Amino acid sequence: MSWQAYVDDHLKCDIEGHEGHRLTAAAIVGHDSSVWAQSATFPQFKPEEMNGIMTDFNEPGHLAPTGLHLGGTKYMVIQGEAGAVIRGKKGSGGITIKKTGQALVFGIYEEPVTPGQCNMVVERLGDYLLEQGL
């Protein structure tokens, strides 16, 4: 399966039990900031934004004072899982980022998708990739 198929079929799919509810944007990005696959709506990010995200995985709490920035959008960092998941909130939407051995799985959502639904979709794919040694 191509990386794009993972984004299209596992991240941008309908949320279980909620036909038509999908993540706004999604991507799989390598630890080196190379984009493996992304939805057409995924924001163009700056290298320093990705560096900040990687630093927060290695030093949990790094982004809390400044917020998480992606594509120029600022998210307030909310409770995640140290070294494994970063979650952010902005208005009625937000972001979930799951770290795997080689990549970061991104999901961005807006209402009616809930934070929990975004977490489920992103973390399920991230956990699968971890199980595959990726």
Swiss-Prot record:
PROSITE patterns tied to this protein: PROFILIN
Protein name (Swiss-Prot/TrEMBL): Profilin-2
Highest taxon above the source species: Eukaryota
Pfam families named in the record: Profilin
Primary role: Binds to actin and affects the structure of the cytoskeleton. At high concentrations, profilin prevents the polymerization of actin, whereas it enhances it at low concentrations.
Residues bearing the modification Phosphothreonine: 114
Gene3D superfamilies with a match to the protein in the record: Dynein light chain 2a, cytoplasmic
Subunit structure: Occurs in many kinds of cells as a complex with monomeric actin in a 1:1 ratio.
GO molecular function terms noted in the UniProt entry: actin monomer binding
Cell membrane among keywords: no
Protein's UniProt keywords contain Cytoplasm: yes
Cellular component GO terms, alphabetical: cell cortex; cytoskeleton
Organism in which the protein naturally occurs: Olea europaea (Common olive)
SUPFAM superfamilies (alphabetical): Profilin (actin-binding protein) (SSF55770)
Entry keywords, A to Z: Actin-binding, Allergen, Cytoplasm, Cytoskeleton, Disulfide bond, Phosphoprotein
PANTHER family tied to this protein: PROFILIN (PTHR11604), PROFILIN-5 (PTHR11604:SF25)
Motif (Involved in PIP2 interaction): 84-100
SMART domains the UniProt entry points to: PROF
